[in-house]
């Protein structure tokens, strides 16, 4: 039973904690927060042992009546691996100041830069490369979504180049500080955006084949991607078939009422998903088209949750718990109730 410490019980951390708890071969030994808020209180209510992420802040939790077990240095020795879910940029400091110092394996999230880790993880593409490694980055929600779709396409034809426009949500639903409220913002205003090179850290052979551009729009529910992928030749039916055969990606039909990110989120609610999480990538079947060997399709990405199962598989890879990535994917999917 792998002992997992979650450093940062926020949007990603609380989801990773719940996902770890669902597995038969791993357990959460503790979660951390930097300050006492409702999430810290909820962690304790859910039965997680709570630790301060910052040494010396334990009294702040005690003053708020939140049961605190100590700080991260009181628990880290017991961990086999740490899943770092701190805000972007903090993970780099934690690698140097905590994980390397205590000789602990750690997974950081996509907000960290690739040069600070040994490799970038995706369950389909880089499980074998990350096997037994010490410091790995689980790539961002957008990169995860693109990697899954490109895997499906690559399984049925050779990819010559990919062009992707990312329509990004302005903020997460719980974030009242970000925006925009009444604007469409090129982010970044330069092309390419960082998303293409990030895909290249997972799939080195695509490094010079993918170019991305990104904009932010006033919505909170999901991102959207519009892909244009030039190939050596395929058909619409072959692409759809490849999508249906690839784990954690599936087709949805606008004709059936799933015609927007709003209705997709409603679908996630209706099937009983916690926090309406959609761990899979939905691709609109009607959007799939092939013109002169170029594939066109549109997909949605639930930014709060699609990376969660990847973190679970990454734990197994780094701790050498399972050699076969497909077996790990199947274990994770079954435990979490992922559609396929």
Curated annotation (Swiss-Prot):
Record organism: Methanococcus aeolicus (strain ATCC BAA-1280 / DSM 17508 / OCM 812 / Nankai-3)
Binding site for NAD(+): 11-12, 111, 169, 303
GO BP term (any one): glycolytic process
Subunit details: Homotetramer.
NCBIfam families: GAPDH-II_archae, PRK04207.1
UniProt-annotated catalytic positions: 141
One GO cellular component, as annotated: cytoplasm
Keywords for the protein's UniProt record, in alphabetical order: Cytoplasm, Glycolysis, NAD, NADP, Oxidoreductase
GO molecular function: glyceraldehyde-3-phosphate dehydrogenase (NAD+) (phosphorylating) activity; glyceraldehyde-3-phosphate dehydrogenase (NADP+) (phosphorylating) activity; NAD binding; NADP binding
Descriptive protein name: Glyceraldehyde-3-phosphate dehydrogenase
EC number: 1.2.1.59
Family: Belongs to the glyceraldehyde-3-phosphate dehydrogenase family.
Pfam families per record: Gp_dh_C
Locations listed in the record: Cytoplasm
Binding site for D-glyceraldehyde 3-phosphate: 140-142, 195-196
InterPro entries tied to this protein: GlycerAld/Erythrose_P_DH, GlycerAld_3-P_DH_AS, GlycerAld_3-P_DH_cat, GlycerAld_3-P_DH_NAD(P)-bd, Glyceraldehyde-3-P_DH_2_arc, NAD(P)-bd_dom_sf
Major place of residence: cytoplasm
